[in-house]
């Protein structure tokens, strides 16, 4: 007697359906109510999204809402780009509220509404690691710390590390204050970094992590100029590198960075077309080579955006298809639009996207390990003194 597929065990049905292409899932959902419910379950989503991301040509976009992760795929074809909501992952409990999220190789660094701790989350594996912060600084409810996630290369493995810093470089010299510290996932210890910054990184500039290191748009600390450089933090050496020049020789009122397949950096520039106008054009450049002390660039795309698109909050590119994807609010601050632009101009505008802070996403098998009890260590007395000195300096400068 033949067995009907609906009578098979749930885990076997999930395994079968996980091999169905994303573009064919609509037919599966319409077959019956139970299959529709199964296709939206968290256990099925983990398996299906993981396989689909490597099987199909698409860009996966995620957005962390207060306590959950939404997933959307964008497919760029030769006819019409398409977007589809793919599912959700939940972060433990609804009481955990997320303010900000940074993405790195399938891991999410979540800055919580609770100012005393953060969480590193692999939604694909369902693993989390909570980190207790030594101090928080949120005057008027605004978090002035900046954050980055990366890893240090060791002989046999890679070790996750977490950087955060506070830097009031735009103050008068006598009022300047900076504090850079790093957290080691293996030891569970904080270390105050001995740095004298020659750079300035604005708090509104998001970072990009690539091959274990993190990059920011930056400026020379001693000047009032634009962000004409990028700067890298090396998690293995635990130090910043030199300022590396950006490729444009035009004054840019805005610079943003993105990753290209976890292999290259992309830089987006916003240029004013005329000194007396508010019309702009965008340029995108991609790195052809990037090392500790040098970087080379190649122009990818130029876009005259008047009047179709505002300043992109986040952007991604498909290098092979010569396509740009950027999110902006347009004239409606409560709505979000996704603009898809190619060499020939606008391809499509997706309206009313229900995303707050979207970023690209590829499911990852990177382990977020818990700190073993037998490896618990106490902070050294020297580090405790450095921490106390920074707290005192911060209070004296009137910024606590």
UniProtKB/Swiss-Prot annotation:
Domain F-box: 2-47
PROSITE patterns: FBOX
InterPro entries: F-box-assoc_dom_typ1, F-box-assoc_interact_dom, F-box-like_dom_sf, F-box_dom, SCF_F-box_component
Domain of life (superkingdom): Eukaryota
SUPFAM superfamilies, per database record: F-box domain (SSF81383)
Protein name, UniProt field: Putative F-box protein At5g41510
Gene source species: Arabidopsis thaliana (Mouse-ear cress)
